[in-house]
Amino acid sequence: MNDSETDSPSIKALIVFRENGETDNLFVPILCDAIRMAGIDVRCSTKEFWESDKHYDIIHFQWPEEVVGWTCNDPDIIRCLEERISFFRSRGARFVYTRHNVRPHYANGIISRAYDIIESQSDIVAHMGRFSRDEFLTKYPDSQNVVIPHHIYQYTYKEDISVERARQYLNLSQDAFIVTAFGKFRNREELRMVLGAFRAWDEAHKMLLAPRLYPFSRRNSYGKNFIKRWISKAGYYLLMPLLNRMYKLQAGANDELIDNCDLPYYMAASDVIFIQRKDILNSGNVPLAFLYHKVVVGPKVGNIGELLSETGNPTFDPDDKKDILRALEEARRLAAWGQGEVNYAYGMENMSIRKVGQAYAQTYKQAING
């Protein structure tokens, strides 16, 4: 270890995030390890934030929903949140907030208020791109902000998987040009955007790999509502296979998570990763794609559009089908020209776990020193 990794062993930090590991988003567990590697005494716990009277130098917020609950509707939680922040601040703690979202689409008034409190009470706000920083400054012109990129997922998934092996494992054509859209499709607009453009794309060997596309379920998701339950199961067992054959898709139900053991095979099997959001600030699928040497095509919005443009990956207007088709064509050419290797080199140089961990350690020191 060099000096920068060992000169702050006394800093105690609490990342307010569940500690039981029950999450399909590994951003925080990996970040916690990276910060620990940089010499910080850090732990993840939501319970610790609410119940402990231990001293911490840094309280590090991630998603405000992790603090108050993802479906919180208790108005008293806001008073409790303010009291806990005041308590830790009275003990000398400083607050850092990593801004993942502007506001979630489903946020109720209580969750929105939690965002307001955490945004305004944090001593330093960390952003994953300049877009987020500049937008935040318009609302909080006196805030302190830093830009720290999203880490790539080194040492997390199996990385040495060939395209051929991955496609064999997933039972996919070796000859297809595979465009993969990860993550749950959230609404009809995303479905229409992706399926409309993909159907119109003049690529003979195209295949869309979208493991969480369809709004159907084989589970009993609708309780006693027999009609909705029947429609959902009929869609799952009858419509999904039919639509997959008709439109050259390999798509599944949006309530079925990808197992972490299978995820690297989906990445390795792909030619291009498609970010299917129309309005989003950040996406972990971009750094993950960079780790797997893949070209990424995504919307010209948020930090995503900024990063893709800076690294030479195609972006598009999500409301313009012709522009999406242009971006897909450009992605196909870039995949053949080796843009994926350029992405990997960029990620390793600028988004490595080591570099991101050191940047957060430095941010902690900055917050403590004022």
Where are these regions (language model features)?
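Short acidic/histidine- and often glycine-rich active-site loop of Leloir-type glycosyltransferases
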Residues: 288, 301-315
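A charged, aromatic-enriched C-terminal amphipathic alpha-helix characteristic of glycosyltransferases
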Residues: 335-369
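A short helix/loop element that forms part of the nucleotide-sugar donor recognition site in Leloir-type
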Residues: 158-172
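Conserved donor-binding/catalytic core segment of Leloir-type glycosyltransferases
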Residues: 172-189, 195-199, 209
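Donor nucleotide-sugar binding/catalytic pocket of nucleotide-sugar-dependent glycosyltransferases
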Residues: 120-137, 141-158
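Short hydrophobic beta-strand element within catalytic cores of glycosyltransferases
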Residues: 275, 295-298
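Nucleotide-activated donor-binding/catalytic signature segment of Leloir-type glycosyltransferases, i.e.
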Residues: 218-265
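Conserved acidic donor-binding segment of nucleotide-sugar-dependent glycosyltransferases
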Residues: 309-322, 329-336
